[in-house]
Design a protein with these regions (language model features):
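Trp/Gly-enriched beta-strand/coil motifs that build multi-repeat beta-propeller-like domains
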Residues: 1-286
């Protein structure tokens, strides 16, 4: 479990395997957290996108060095992912209906992808929808629940897309691989009935699971390490005297519920595999 605290720019990570705690100051108020594996070492790096100067600040886990490319504009939406399949997260932004990607294979910024996709009112839902190991440019249309992704597996021919109607107006799209087949599934969380609706790509079966409350914030991730995305929510403070947030996780490996307090009201959930081996002072983590 991990959160980024906008008020002080600190990341708080709880390792669910060994129980270790990590606190890392990285970022400042106004930044947007963009964790990813920017150095290709298999660990998520602490990273933020700063709209004021359109600069990405990445603290590389492999050597502790800072990677800080300028990419985008102040009003852009960051959409990092591994768009070239080299095992490293690429910096990318979405501006209105156009995606701008700087490929990590060429850090000079000369190798880029510029792709118009969807409408400005669509939501970005980048993921690997064709299972080729590359992040696909994709959008979700809130008005009718339509997903549309541009397949990266067909780069030399006429671009092909995947279109799926999955969801309804008001649903919240969730990006994850819930069946562990290395293909992003179509999934939504509907606050009105608190049901997760997932179309599993492995066998095209439907999974419906009631989980959470209408005011919860979805936070899917692989919390039990079985290679499948787990259904999870973060519940903000429930009383005026308790400012802590509570995580509720449904483990895909055994169906057991896990719950734990982690973070404060106003923190941004950033779950993932950080695997920090050093434990920083963490007196205010929770």
């Amino acid at each position: 479990m991990a959160v980024w605290r906008p008020s002080n720019g600190t990341w708080y990570v709880y390792n669910m395997v060994d129980g270790s705690l990590t606190a890392q100051l990285w970022g400042q108020a106004g930044d947007k957290p963009v964790p990813g594996d920017y150095d290709g070492d298999g660990k998520l790096d602490f990273a933020v996108f700063r709209p004021s100067n359109a600069t990405w600040y990445v603290l590389r886990s492999s050597d502790g060095q800072v990677y800080g490319p300028q990419w985008g504009q102040s009003s852009d939406e960051p959409v990092p992912g591994d768009y070239d399949g080299d095992g490293m997260t690429d910096v990318a932004v979405r501006r209105a209906s156009t995606f701008y990607v700087m490929l990590s294979a060429d850090p000079s910024g000369n190798s880029t992808i510029i792709q118009q996709w969807g409408n400005a009112s669509d939501l970005a839902v980048a993921g690997d929808y064709d299972g080729d190991g590359k992040t696909d440019i994709a959008t979700y249309r809130p008005s009718d629940g339509t997903w549309t992704s541009l397949k990266s597996s067909n780069p030399e021919e006429e671009p092909t897309s995947i279109t799926m109607q999955w969801g309804a107006s008001g649903d919240q799209p969730q990006v994850g691989d819930f069946d562990g087949d290395n293909i992003t599934d179509f999934a939504t969380f509907r606050a009105s009935d608190t049901v997760w609706r997932i179309l599993l790509t492995f066998d095209n079966s439907n999974l419906e699971q009631q989980w959470g409350l209408s005011t919860d914030k979805p936070a899917p991730g692989d919390y039990d390490g079985d290679g499948k995305t787990d259904i999870a929510v973060v519940r903000p403070r429930v009383s005026e005297t308790d400012n802590h947030s509570t995580w509720y996780i449904l483990r895909s490996s055994d169906g057991v519920m896990m719950s734990a307090q982690w973070g404060l009201d106003g923190d941004i959930a950033v779950p993932g595999k950080y695997n920090r081996v050093t434990q920083a002072a963490c007196t205010n983590c929770q």
